Amino acid sequence: MMEIDKYKNLRYRLMESEKWPLKYMFKFIVPNEAGKVDQVKALLPKGGKVTFKHTANLKHVSVTCVALMESADQIIVITEKADKIEGVIVL
């Protein structure tokens, strides 16, 4: 139930924006294991500017993507899919 509320809140905040398409920044903390970074990268919009930063101990990778998005629903779909990958933290 809490997860649904989180996305409802995000959708509401996004819908407050009157300017679509808009630049949106996705940010995820991803375990540096078993292709999980590639799984997250595959979800990101094509043409987005993606950057990676490893933690000091190399256990996690911060994945950031700034992309022009057409709708709140597009953003929610990507966020939900990333959140389902084990160990991924959505920021």
Kindly give the residue locations of the regions a language model identified:
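Long, contiguous binding/interaction regions
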Residues: M1-S62, V66-L91
